[in-house]
Amino acid sequence: MKPVIALVGRPNVGKSTLFNRLTRSRDALVADLPGLTRDRHYGEGRVGGERPYLVVDTGGFEPVAKDGILFEMARQTRQAVEESDVIVFIVDGRNGLAPQDKSIADYLRKTGRPIFLVVNKAEGMKYTNVAADFYELGLGDPRAISAAHGDGVTEMINEALDVAYAGQPEESDEEKAQHGIKIAIVGRPNVGKSTLVNTLIGEDRVIAFDMPGTTRDSIYVDFERQGKKYTLIDTAGLRKRGKVFEAIEKFSVVKTLQSISDANVVILLLDARQDISEQDAHIAGFVVEQGRALVVGVNKWDGLDPHVRERTKSDLQRKLKFLEFAKFHFISAAEKTGIGPLMRSVDDAYKAAMSKLPTPKLTRALIEAVEFQQPRRRGPVRPKLRYAHQGGQNPPIIVIHGNALDAVTDTYKRYLENRFRETFALTGTPLRIEFRSSTNPYADKD
């Protein structure tokens, strides 16, 4: 599971600036939780090498607030701290130590989480001057950074990740071998995730084992269906009680994002009786960003008026158009209808995601696509697409070589993607296409 780094501090110390720096984007949000003024924002960490992690940006923290907006912001921050593996406590190097900093430090110490004290806005200042005040907090050596300019940020986050990953358990090869296709069932609260879980697991409720982490346990439930092995990743809050699993419908953004990253195939469950929300689209967007195979289940389809069904289908096509690669199934988890086709699509999506695409076949498909429709010229140059090979699996990556490929339009790229999908039956998985141009300065102009 990806570790979680929580950014905590009083208002205006630079938490959002650091969040944007770590996610390398001002719009890298993958999920928002509704609140009063400032919500918890979750993003994919992109600074710190190859180690994946999630970043949580919290509102300004007033730990002693008793009511109103400040109380709500404090509640949001406490929830983020509870979900985190490491806390980055940010203070303001320009304004110095504030009484609120002391209150926050007192609270954070009681959590038992690893804490990195970070002095922001330290650009152009001597470390000894910046750090002096903050030793009083008793949280070890302060780390001086400038979130706005990036100074010290990479070193700081790498140290935090060292600590976070030290607490992450590694699955043994034997444990990995026990698993079938890893499935994450994700969606908003009350869309029927726990009902679908119980329908899939049936009466057996077979092996469950915990992999202890630093702050949370991840539960995997192995089950068989029609002779095939699957492993359900706990997203609905499964907990064993006696010989039975109790499904607790408690939505956790962190749990959802971690489960998506860990899965082979994601089932995005929607409620046919509710409009598609921003939260649904955010979750779907994260699935695509992570390159995970996807099947969409539209639940509670039974008993719906035909006009409502048509309106729902139209709404899905309009709001989730970017999921055209995925199969949509209209099901009732409670009535156990549509579950068989849903699971067959899970199998197909996994097979597509893990496809091995031979270079000769890829190149032949590329040549046929170009012969049917050539890319447009850009000025005097027409892109020349020469050959293709596979660059990875889960999701499949197709690397195309040629000349002047930076002139290939997004429209033509989508055309190629659709041709490859059709040729190699790549339904249910995102598909990445990468272009690598020749550096030959004497490449032919068409």
Curated annotation (Swiss-Prot):
Pfam family name, one: KH_dom-like
Binding-site positions, GTP 1: 9-16, 57-61, 120-123
Binding sites annotated in the UniProt record for GTP 2: 187-194, 234-238, 299-302
Domain named KH-like: residues: 355-439
The organism's place on the tree of life at top rank: Bacteria
UniProt keyword terms in alphabetical order: GTP-binding, Nucleotide-binding, Repeat, Ribosome biogenesis
Presence of the UniProt keyword 4Fe-4S in the record: no
Keyword GTP-binding found: yes
Domain EngA-type G: 3-168, 181-354
Single Gene Ontology MF annotation: ribosome binding
GO BP terms in the entry: ribosome biogenesis
Subunit structure: Associates with the 50S ribosomal subunit.
Protein family per UniProt: Belongs to the TRAFAC class TrmE-Era-EngA-EngB-Septin-like GTPase superfamily. EngA (Der) GTPase family.
Function: GTPase that plays an essential role in the late steps of ribosome biogenesis.
Stored PANTHER family: GTPASE DER
Protein known as: GTPase Der
Protein source organism: Paraburkholderia phymatum (strain DSM 17167 / CIP 108236 / LMG 21445 / STM815)
